[in-house]
Each structure stands twice: as structure tokens, then as C-alpha cells.
Amino acid sequence: MKRSAFFISDGTGITAETLGQSLLAQFENITFNKFTRPYIDSVEKARAMVQQINNAADKDDVRPIIFDTIVNQDIREILATSNGFMIDIFSTFLAPLEQELSSHSSYSVGKSHSIGHNSNYMERIEAVNFALDNDDGARTHYYDKADIILVGVSRCGKTPTCLYMAMQFGIRAANYPLTEDDMERLQLPAALKEHRSKLFGLTIDPDRLTAIRHERKPNSRYSSYAQCEFEVREVESLFRRENIPNINSTHFSVEEISAKVLVEKGVERRFK
């Protein structure tokens, strides 16, 4: 079964998309065609959006799901005329919260991410820069400044996890790819030994690793199942031998991996 889903906002659309994606993920038997539409901030744009929604309804022969964080009442009313099932995120959650707090909300779109009022902005940028500078074992002499160091075979999800932790939580995360040479030495690389307390391992199912590597280097030794199976087996053995906490990333999203890593290592988020 297929359904169209729209994430609509008069701001960046991050809130609508994040919450909407999380909710839709609970319905694994349905395939969603997803469309993010930020900055729908005028009557003209709203009317054009209604046409897009109605076109999707006609094409799918079923009304689309709409997640919106629209602040402007006039624009919301226009969207409500579409042939879609609307979930107004702000009104759904803010109304009961206003009642509980005995206070009216400001209904300010994008407030939680405002640069001008967010003292965490520079820390977020510094964390992202750290993740980029210390990606893939490129530099190891700043590991003393890292909050956490992810280790694992190439293409197991280390880089996106580091960037997510940096962007969302201000975590200074480095990552180091364990190579065939490291595995043959049967011990941690020298650059990692003195930072053992910061290490966390990612592993992955060999068949999934094969598929990922095949997209990068098809029909190569690097992407062969035999090579992937060997590397995964050896790196998991290294994790056990060195007592490095680890998780299998195969069936988890970047968000889930990040949360599990922080909990396992007891690393506090710099901001929430």
C-alpha cells in the first residue's frame, strides 16, 4: 500500500519532518512517498500547496497525510481545504500544554533553532567542525579533546553518527576505521590505546556491509561478501578481546545509534 505524506511548515520544516517521519516509521507495511515543503509562508504558496496535495490524492486514489507546523491562521485554513488528512503539530501539543501551564504560547515558528537567541549555536558549529576534522582517522592528535571515538570497519555508519551527535547534541565525536592491518596485529592501533575509555564500536551484518560497499566500489575485493564477512568477524573479535562496548548498526537509524552510544558511554549531551 502506498500513501503520500507532506511535511509542511512556514519555517524550515525540521520539526514537522522529524516528528512526521518518526510517526510514519511505525507503519512498516505502508510505503510513503514523502514530500517536505518548507517556507509555505504566503496565501499564494498555500494555494499552490493545496493543488499539490489534491493532485497527490487523485494520483494515489487516497488522501495524503499532512504534518504541518504552520503558525499563520489564514494559511492553515487554506491548507485545511485540501483533500488531505491534516495533523497540526502545534495545535495538537500546544493546546493541552497551554492549559497545563496556564499560559498562552507565542506560536513562534523555528524558535528552538533561532541563531540569535541560541547560546549553543557556536558550540554546535565547533562540534560539527571537530567531527569533520577527525573523520575516518584522518587526524588522531586531537583525540584528547574528543568526547567519544567510534571505531569499526569502513562503511558501518561511523561518520553519519558522529555528525548527528555533533549537530544535535554538541558532542565532539571522532571516528577511526579499523583496517585489515589493524586486525592482523590482533591489537588496538597505537593512536587508540591511550584513549581506550572513549572508544565505542559499531559493527554491521556482512550482507548489509556488502550492499553498502557495492554502491561505492562494485565488483571489488573491498565489496565482496567474503571480505566483508572476514572484516566483521575480526573486528567483533577485537571488540571482545579489548572489552570495547559496541552495537550492531544494521537495523538502527542514525538517531537510534547515537542515543544508544551516549547512554552506553554515559556521555552527557551538551545541549538538548
From Swiss-Prot:
The keyword Lyase does not apply. GO terms for molecular function: ADP binding; ATP binding; phosphotransferase activity, phosphate group as acceptor; protein serine/threonine kinase activity. Signal peptide: none annotated. It is an enzyme of class 2 (transferase). ADP binds at residues 152-159. Keywords: Kinase, Nucleotide-binding, Serine/threonine-protein kinase, Transferase. Pfam families: Kinase-PPPase. Its EC number is 2.7.11.33, 2.7.4.28. It catalyses: [pyruvate, water dikinase] + ADP = [pyruvate, water dikinase]-phosphate + AMP + H(+); [pyruvate, water dikinase]-phosphate + phosphate + H(+) = [pyruvate, water dikinase] + diphosphate. PANTHER family: PYRUVATE, PHOSPHATE DIKINASE REGULATORY PROTEIN 1, CHLOROPLASTIC (PTHR31756:SF3). Bifunctional serine/threonine kinase and phosphorylase involved in the regulation of the phosphoenolpyruvate synthase (PEPS) by catalyzing its phosphorylation/dephosphorylation. Belongs to the pyruvate, phosphate/water dikinase regulatory protein family. PSRP subfamily. This is Putative phosphoenolpyruvate synthase regulatory protein.
